Amino acid sequence: MKMVKRYAGILMMLTLLVGFTSCEDDEDIYDDLMGRTWVGDLWFGYDDNPIESGIRLDNNGLGIDYQVYDYNGRPAGDLPFRWWVDYGTLYLDYGRDFELREIRGVRVRGRYLQGDLYLDGEYIDYIELQMQQ
């Protein structure tokens, strides 16, 4: 009987522990991302000619990616995209000509957007994008 009470107590403590831990919900993430421009590598371009992205996320679920060549800073073009956050993942949909980009476990820490980048469901790398003023 003592053994049952002991295990019941441990189970109760674990239940409370899980109940009090929380993840940032999608609305909080959405608010942190919206209306800002985030600059970094979203895996456009080629190894010998990489492109840096500056993504602006507007509150209507649309955005624009101001792309520049990483080596010389010359404009590479602007790409419109749709974006949304679902279950802690930021989705960037540039249309059929480009892979769907997912930033899983997305979080904003200070001036940095951080997470794991996936292209069409395949893990690429951990990334950090810096917020621009």
Give the positions of each predicted feature.
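Acyl-CoA/ACP chain-elongation machinery
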Residues: 83
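Lipid interaction determinants
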Residues: 24-78, 89-133
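C-terminal motif of bacterial Sec signal peptides marking the signal peptidase cleavage site
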Residues: 18-22
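Hydrophobic helical h-region of N-terminal Sec-dependent signal peptides
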Residues: 9-17
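Bacterial N-terminal signal peptides that target proteins for export
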Residues: 1-10
